[in-house]
Curated annotation (Swiss-Prot):
Keywords: Cytoplasm, Isomerase, Porphyrin biosynthesis, Pyridoxal phosphate. Its cofactor is pyridoxal 5'-phosphate. It is found in: Cytoplasm. The modification N6-(pyridoxal phosphate)lysine is found at K265. It comes from the Bacteria. Transmembrane segments: none annotated. This is Glutamate-1-semialdehyde 2,1-aminomutase. It comes from Shewanella woodyi (strain ATCC 51908 / MS32).
Length: 428
């Protein structure tokens, strides 16, 4: 029994399922999760001392790599002044200014402490601003675990939402409509059905919680036009994509202007953080300037702001995103080439520093139903093969992979060589 195995058994006695977030339990791939002791650059190290090339990056925030010296130094300096004040600080002003500088659609910003808090607050604000109750989300898109957002289509894209978890009253879920990602017609039908009841559309501009699904051409533009036509707000959830796919997020990459944006992950440099912002007239509707209430004890935490600002400054370096995208393309295309070489069908998607791969014969995966029809047996086999080779991927076929600027030529070559060996074994 490894030290990770021992820790997992110990954890299950005091923590539900032995983990503090379900995907970490390895239920999607089987076996026991690796307990991590430390991380540096492109590597994480488990409790048994084994090193892994990491393509999870704490689920996205570690875009510069783990334990980056400038971020670490910023945190250490901030700690010297205290951990939390419950009062305004200059750091949170600087963070808001930096976000607004990099994302033009965000005229004002409110800091919170998690992505869930950001999306939950943005939804409440949209409902208050429009005086409408219903929201529209997409099947397979994840926006945190707030009650109104843990909903997917019941019996097709055009049905009223059904709760995806016990503990969510149907009275909450009935106000959440679910459409099919990358299919505008399903959205149009719902707006025709409820023309004056839908407050907003919320979506991941690159769906990173059904693996990695970019928007098809015209999809985001179509959503913008529908919102304008019916007086609804467009909320782009960039908790995952913000400053991950480009300097101005997915909205900058695809040239789309939302009314509200939610952020997290990258803006904290590895610390707990979230934010939402957008049009000034909408943001002025939130307390204390408006009637929509939102608050948080640790919002704008100085340690998180310090870490985030240090990371954001580094992300402004010339050519950084082009280099990151090139690395991501190399890994994704390399996986597909190695799989196909050994007669294993694979489809890939990648945008900026995100990538996904699917064990399927379909040339392109653009919808959630295609993701669910992929080969369910090949992913765990590939996953554990790569884990044995010292490559740490997301332990679920429904999660995107992430690269960092710390992934160099050595790590890329070793990863692709490992994939070649694993696919060769799988083909036997």
């Amino acid at each position: 029994m490894t030290r990770s195995d021992e820790l997992f058994e110990q954890a299950k006695k005091t923590i539900p399922g032995g983990v503090n977030s379900p995907v970490r339990a390895f239920n999607g791939v089987g076996g026991s999760p690796r307990f991590i002791d430390k991380a540096d650059g492109a590597y994480i190290y488990d409790a048994d001392g084994k090193a892994y090339i990491d393509y999870v990056g704490s689920w996205g925030p570690m875009i510069l790599g783990h334990n980056h010296p400038k971020i670490r130094q910023a945190v250490l300096e901030a700690v010297e002044n205290g951990l939390s004040f419950g009062a305004p600080t200059e750091l949170e002003v600087k963070m808001a200014e930096k976000v607004i500088e990099m994302v033009p659609s965000m005229e004002q910003v409110r800091m919170v402490s998690s992505g869930t808090e950001a999306t939950m607050s943005a939804i409440r604000l949209a409902r208050g601003f429009t005086n409408r109750d219903k929201i529209l989300k997409f099947e397979g898109c994840y926006h945190g675990h707030a009650d109104c957002l843990l909903v997917k289509a019941g019996s097709g894209a055009l049905t009223l939402g059904q709760p995806s978890s016990p503990g969510i009253p149907e009275d909450f879920a009935k106000h959440t409509l679910t459409a099919t990602y990358n299919e505008l017609e399903s959205v149009k039908t719902l707006f025709e059905q409820y023309p004056e009841e839908i407050s907003c559309i919320i979506l991941e501009p690159v769906a990173g919680n059904m693996n990695c699904i970019p928007p098809v051409e015209g999809f985001l533009e179509g959503l913008r036009a529908i919102c304008d036509q019916y007086g609804a707000l467009l909320i782009i959830d960039e908790v995952m994509t913000g400053f991950r796919v480009s300097k101005s997020g997915a909205q900058g990459h695809y040239g789309i202007t939302p009314d509200l944006t939610t952020l997290g992950k990258v803006i904290g440099g590895g610390m707990p953080v979230g934010a939402f912002g957008g049009r000034k007239d909408v943001m002025q509707f939130i307390a204390p300037t408006g009637p929509v209430y939102q608050a948080g004890t640790l919002s704008g935490n100085p340690i998180a702001m310090s870490a985030g600002l240090a990371q954001m400054e580094e992300l402004c370096a010339e050519g950084l995103y082009q280099e990151l995208a090139a690395k991501t393309k190399r890994i994704a295309e390399g996986f597909k080439a190695a799989a196909n070489k050994h007669g294993i069908p694979m489809s890939i998607n990648y945008v900026g520093g995100m990538f996904g791969f699917f064990f399927t014969e379909e040339e392109k995966v653009t919808r959630f139903d295609q993701v669910t029809q992929c080969d369910a047996e090949k992913f765990p086999e590939f996953y554990h093969g790569m884990l044995d080779e010292g490559v740490y991927l997301a332990p679920s076929a429904y999660e995107a992979g992430f690269l960092s600027m710390a992934h160099g030529e050595k790590e890329l070559e070793e990863t692709l060589a490992a994939a070649e060996r694993v696919f060769a074994k799988m083909a036997k």
